[in-house]
Design a protein with these regions (language model features):
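Non-catalytic cap/lid and distal C-terminal segments of serine-dependent acyl enzymes
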Residues: 1-276
Length: 276
């Protein structure tokens, strides 16, 4: 038993107005050990999408969380950091986590219009969330100390923000990216970008895909996920990153779930925080 893991981490909760919906969004902030005692210390910040799934399994969509609090407590040698969970928009999640409208999904045969608010969500993060966090807490606001982590569609929007706002975000954790949903659009977009001094951790399992995905794609879902991550790795190298700035983790039998992603969160945090 690791007695060093038994300590309290303070969490704060805030409501911030989302400009494109006019509604408030819950933002939760997990502060590092000793934050209140050392008033002269400043910290890197890790922003995590799908905030409902980040901290507690009881409120997670899947019934499993990312186990962020145990990950921090059980790895005390990692650099201290602030973790910010940004809730998704529930029924509007697919819209705000997709920079482009979906054009060729089976589900669209029912007359639905999905996607296309990713740019607005990115603006919300850059112009509302991050300035609020930087002004409220003792952060290191520079890009090299600012990370974003997401999974599935939450990974898609992380990939987009990492390119669109590369001057703001210097570290990414991309788990089980579903950018096969907008593959042609993403490929064109990333081909226009040059990237430098960014650390990116990429995780994908060999047993990806869930019941929701089956409504969104035809074909081999497992291969779609693997190809999306392998392509992204190569695209980042073409965009200017070195292999030392990238880590690709293909997990044998890894599934599309928080239970799987949580296992590799400490590895991700170690990699992106290497220079902190």
């Amino acid at each position: 038993m690791n007695r060093d893991a038994y300590f309290y981490l303070e969490m704060k909760e805030h409501e911030l107005k989302v400009p494109y919906t006019g509604k408030n969004r819950r933002i939760r902030v997990l502060l590092p050990k000793g934050y209140a005692q050392d008033e002269h210390k400043y910290y890197p910040v890790v922003y995590m999408n799908d905030g409902q799934n980040v901290f507690y399994s009881g409120e997670s969509f899947s019934g499993h969380s990312w186990k962020v609090i145990p990950a921090i407590k059980r790895n005390p040698d990692m650099p201290k950091m602030i973790i910010v969970g940004i809730d998704n928009d529930n029924e509007g999640r697919m819209n705000e986590y997709a920079p482009w409208k979906f054009s060729s999904l089976p589900i669209l045969n029912f007359g639905l219009t999905l996607g296309g608010l990713g740019s607005e969500y990115a603006d919300f993060f850059v112009n509302v969330v991050k300035p609020f966090i930087d002004s409220t807490y003792r952060t290191k606001p520079q890009r090299e100390y600012t990370a974003m982590i997401g999974s599935s569609l939450g990974a898609n929007i992380s990939q987009y923000i990492g390119l669109e706002h590369k001057d703001v975000v210097g570290c990414l954790g991309v788990f089980s990216s579903a950018n096969w949903l907008n593959k042609p659009e993403f490929d064109r977009y990333i081909s226009k970008h040059k990237v430098s001094d960014q650390r990116v951790y990429i995780e994908v399992g060999t047993n990806e895909g869930d019941d929701t995905d089956k409504q969104l794609a035809n074909g081999n879902l497992k291969q779609l996920y693997i190809d999306a991550s392998l392509d992204y790795y190569r695209q980042l190298i073409d965009a200017g990153l070195s292999t030392s700035e990238l880590k690709l983790n293909v997990v044998a039998n890894g599934e599309h779930s928080e239970e799987c992603w949580a296992k590799y969160l400490p590895e991700c945090l170690r990699f992106i925080s290497e220079n902190w």
